[in-house]
Amino acid sequence: MGNAQDALKAKADYVTKNLEEDGILHALEELKMVEKELHLPQTKMDQETGPIATIHTNYGDLKIRLFPEQAPKTVANFIALAKDGYYNGVIFHRVIKDFMIQGGDPTGTGMGGESIYGESFEDEFSEELYNIRGALSMANAGPNTNGSQFFIVQNQHLPYSKKEIARGGWPEAIAEIYAEEGGTPHLDRRHTVFGQLMDEASYQVLDTIAAVETGAMDKPKEDVVMESIDIEGEA
């Protein structure tokens, strides 16, 4: 009986705290008594106004909208490195068709790279960003180990319906994209999403890179090079 009372008191305290700090709607959302209203920028790319990164590769350009509101520290890191020329000449060292393309390590081995913060920095998971096809996401070696490496999701097909994905807890709009366009939902809340491809030409370049011949450790046999990255707009 005591355990049940303690649990009830803890829940009541939690509700009271949320009411005092954030209001009744937030408290009800946290208790899942009402559906939380989310801004899902990947579902309305034509309406977004954040900074744009264009990765110029020897296979064409990858144009990406960045999301500083949801991942401020990650976007700031990427923009600063790009403007400093850190990524110039760096290869996509790991390419797996129907999965993703990964780069951002100046050593080209997957073992290097660093952030502007002098050390690895923390994950920035958002309920508003997901690893759908075309998502720009941070590569890592475990929780809170972000540096300079990133990947772009290329998968085009998942063996699940929208209903099955939504049942797993994903927002309806995101579940629909996963079901119809693909992605890597198993990476959500494991890798920080901070951008999204913007146009069809970029998706064609992504698919072309993903189809290159690879050797040991999924490394392309012929280098796929980031020649430079241009940044438009401010975070």
Predicted region positions:
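Mg2+-dependent phosphoryl-transfer enzymes with acidic/Ser/Thr/Gly-rich catalytic loops
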Residues: 1-37
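Cyclophilin-like peptidyl-prolyl cis-trans isomerases
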Residues: 36-235
